[in-house]
Amino acid sequence: MQLEVRNLSVAIHRRPIVSGVSLTVDNGEFVGMLGPNGCGKSTTLRAIYRLNRKYSGLIMWDGKDEHTITQKEFARRVAVASQFNDIAFDFTVREVVLMGRAPHMGMLTRETDSDQEIVAQSLDMVDMAHFSDRSFASLSGGEKQRVILARALAQKPEFLILDEPTNHLDIKHQLQTLAIARDLGISCLAALHDLAMASRFVDRVYLMKAGSVVASGPVGEVVTSERIHEVYDVEARVTPAGPAGDDWDGGLTVAYRYPQRVR
């Protein structure tokens, strides 16, 4: 599933948050959005996945204006795993993941054996099968994050949107989450913080600062010492993670140094 965003702008309480953002995600491509806190990554994603419909610009899915796509079709084809995981009622983990099947079920129909199998597979993918009968509210932040990802996987989407998907996760599950997104073979757009981690998995990145895209392209061309200093206001040294051809090939190592000693 293809996504094209043209000249997207969003203002909140008349204050511009996102200004003129344009981006594309092709079929099967894993694209990352990078940038410091408050740069507009999440605001851009919320417009794309319809949480905020008050925007100017154009959002197109497979060449169709998003306003021509029904909510039911959108929910069947696009899944979202966001960083805000509060659920008002006390559901079990299995019940939360089963919500991902809702777009594929009728109003008055119950889940099928196939739905239950998809839920079990999704929980297994994120190492949460052994928690399936636990209360969602009782989980840690990282465990909740993995359940929300499982819910998105259970939708069997054509396009996956991830908003800070590795927040609260230990290193193993950060790697697992991004590997899942890469290996699904579907289109994925993810807002990420860890530059080195992103470099191991995504095909291209958009680097944002103050609500605008300042650079885009392959990670190795965008994530440079100069750009990190420009966007994040820290000194950085960027090097390949390993010699070409070995198991580390394709990633970057990013070392940081704050320019002044904090007193």
Model segments located where?
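Conserved ABC ATPase "signature" region
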Residues: L98, D113-F131
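Helix-to-loop junction immediately C-terminal to a conserved catalytic motif
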Residues: Y49
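Conserved structural motif at the start of ABC-family nucleotide-binding domains
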Residues: L3-V5, V18
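Conserved ABC transporter NBD signature motif
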Residues: G57-D65, F74
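Catalytic Walker B motif of ABC-type/P-loop ATPase nucleotide-binding domains
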Residues: L160-E164
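The feature captures the beta-strand-to-loop junction immediately N-terminal to the Walker
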Residues: L34-P36
